[in-house]
Amino acid sequence: MSQPVRDAWKRLFNDIYAQVPRTLGTLPGYRPALNKNSEKRTSNVYSNVELLEVWRKLNEAPSDRRDAFRLDLITVGRQVLGNYFLDVKMEFDRMVEAKDYQALKACGEKMKEILNDLDKLNAFHPYCSLDKWIDDARKMGDSPQLKDYYEKNARNLITTWGGSLNDYASRSWAGLISDYYAKRWEVYIDTFIKAVGEGVEVDQKQLEDELKEIEEGWVNATCLLYTSPSPR
């Protein structure tokens, strides 16, 4: 193990893991809502700057194509980006309240960029990709009807959970981010930017209905439009 990796794990243990565990996920995987950031699931008690430094040190390590190390890089990196997304989203909500159109647009674009980066990062390992999850589910069926049945259940498990526990089993996976989470966030972002630009209030019921429509449509689909890019 190289020295940068040793330093990274030491810092992770002393500065991050030593804290009282509380975070269960990152905000991109939860349904968007104004001034509501799933605090019990996404808040943390450590500095994201410290975690960013851990990620930087891991990236300084000599090229290592082992699966375990690649997973470490992805896991730490997506937490860094997820924490950053939370910060930008909180600023976005403040700009909604302040009616600052230009600042709101800038925050919205930054949020979309982070979601895109998260999707690309996770694509560097098949265990962090939606296409493997869907493919494995469809392999359980021995007819087109059964394949579709198992795919629907696989989609349901990681998203709406039948409507009773929405986002309970959220996953930061390539494909799921771009094809599902990002679609919801784009509606949220664009809706508030448009409303502030026009000087009107957002119809919260209509927004929620649009988000639910995206969720239900995705769960009931049987066509995976996403293809993971090949790692370089």
Region annotations inferred by a language model:
Residues 1-222:
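C-terminal non-catalytic alpha-helical accessory regions
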Residues 226-231:
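Conserved small/polar residues in nucleotide/adenosyl-binding loops
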